[in-house]
Amino acid sequence: MPLPSRGPAAHPDPRNRPHRRLHARTLTVLDQVVRPAAYSRRALTRQLKHLGLLADDGPDRHRAEEALLIVGELVGNACRHSSGPTLMTSQWHPRTRRLTLAVSDPSPGVPRRKAPDERGEGGGYGVLLIDILAGHWNTVRHGDGGKAVVVTLDFPPPPADPPTPPQQSR
């Protein structure tokens, strides 16, 4: 019986594998991080690249970039409006091509849409942005008084393989 190879074929590039075969769930603890929104975007970027969803010319890149915008907004708001540990969870569901993002914090406050700050100081666009980009989002209360904001993003079906041209007989 031959031993497994240690060459490149033994560890194929995960971006070349079909999405339906990959599973990923990531939990990121953000309470000890200097720039939690940026850190969460980097963590999600690594996961999306591993899944092949952020390929330079891939069909999923645009939706994956929207996920990065959303997670940065969720984490930024959680850190701005609460004190205590903030957690980000992301999970890819390959069969349904759905990405679930959840950001938990100890604050009981629920995100709500407010008028954007027109003075140029920023703020007020987070919930509007999530409403526009997310397929679905809601708030789940925890028993300890905190909450998680959960966002679901549907990715488009993968492109169909081009039809095989008929072979000509000779």
Question: Which stretches of residues belong to each language-model region?
Answer:
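Conserved beta-strand-loop-beta-strand hairpin that lines the nucleotide-binding pocket
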Residues: 1-32, 79-170
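Short, structured helix-loop boundary elements
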Residues: 37, 41, 60-64, 127
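Conserved short strand/loop->alpha-helix "switch" segment adjacent to the catalytic nucleotide/phosphoryl-transfer site
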Residues: 48-72
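Conserved terminal C-lobe alpha helix of the protein kinase catalytic domain
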Residues: 38-41, 45, 68, 72, ...
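Short beta-to-alpha transition helix within the HATPase_c
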Residues: 25-46
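Solvent-exposed, charged/polar functional surfaces in cytosolic regulatory/catalytic domains
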Residues: 43-50, 136
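Metal-dependent amide/peptide-bond hydrolase catalytic core
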Residues: 75
